[in-house]
């Protein structure tokens, strides 16, 4: 495999190599469960998302950590390093039963925390991401170049004109057109969790939905 297909960190995890395409899992851990398998966004304490990712990968459980390039310093000058774009966050594709079992019985998964939302009747519910929305989010968030940026979720509500991209490498992806700080973006927002944007999509490559 080519060198550019891997990233490393200068932290204590620098001895590990992680493939960029690890969210494309073929096999998932099989456990007895009658619950639906969903994409759960999980908070992870103390920037341990890559350690959790490594453990999930070893079990064959699909997961996704959004990554981007950031500048780091070295004795030879600054260089680009691929790092988590949103710290303390990992998306896990599993049933609630499997995730809870891992958290209860495997010490390495204790740092994971479910995220919740308030339902219409005021009750707390576990937050999960619909498959279609997660697929679109991963298609965009897995691209590491200057055309993709991650936004503060406080600046990126879902209010905006909902559209679908009709051509190009992101054909079929759905999102909203939103102006943020005088700039117009094509935005994919996971409420209260994450937001990724394409900085430019030609108007003739968009259709309303």
Language model regions located:
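Short coil-to-beta-strand transition motifs
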Residues: 157, 166-173
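Generic structural signal for buried aliphatic residues
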Residues: 161-163
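Acidic-enriched and Gly/Ser
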Residues: 2, 6-8, 13, 23-159, ...
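Compositionally biased, intrinsically disordered low-complexity segments enriched in Pro/Arg/Gln/His
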Residues: 17-20
């Amino acid at each position: 495999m080519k060198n550019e297909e891997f990233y490393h960190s200068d932290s204590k995890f620098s001895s590990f190599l992680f493939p960029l395409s690890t969210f494309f899992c073929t096999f998932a851990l099989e456990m007895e469960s009658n619950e639906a398998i969903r994409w759960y966004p999980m908070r992870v304490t103390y920037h341990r998302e890559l350690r959790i990712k490594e453990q999930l990968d070893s079990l064959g459980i699909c997961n996704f950590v959004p990554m981007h390039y950031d500048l780091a310093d070295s004795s030879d000058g600054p260089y680009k390093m691929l790092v988590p774009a949103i710290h303390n966050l990992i998306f896990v594709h599993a049933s609630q039963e499997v995730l809870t079992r891992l958290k209860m019985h495997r010490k390495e998964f204790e740092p994971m925390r479910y995220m919740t939302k308030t339902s219409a009747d005021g009750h707390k519910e576990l937050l999960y991401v619909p498959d279609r929305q997660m697929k679109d989010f991963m298609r965009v968030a897995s691209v590491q170049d200057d055309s993709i940026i991650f936004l503060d979720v406080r600046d990126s509500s879902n209010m905006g004109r909902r559209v679908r991209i009709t051509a190009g490498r992101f054909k079929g992806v759905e999102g909203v057109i939103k102006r943020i700080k005088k700039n117009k973006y094509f935005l994919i927002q996971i409420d209260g969790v994450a937001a990724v944007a394409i900085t430019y999509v030609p108007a003739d490559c968009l259709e309303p939905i």
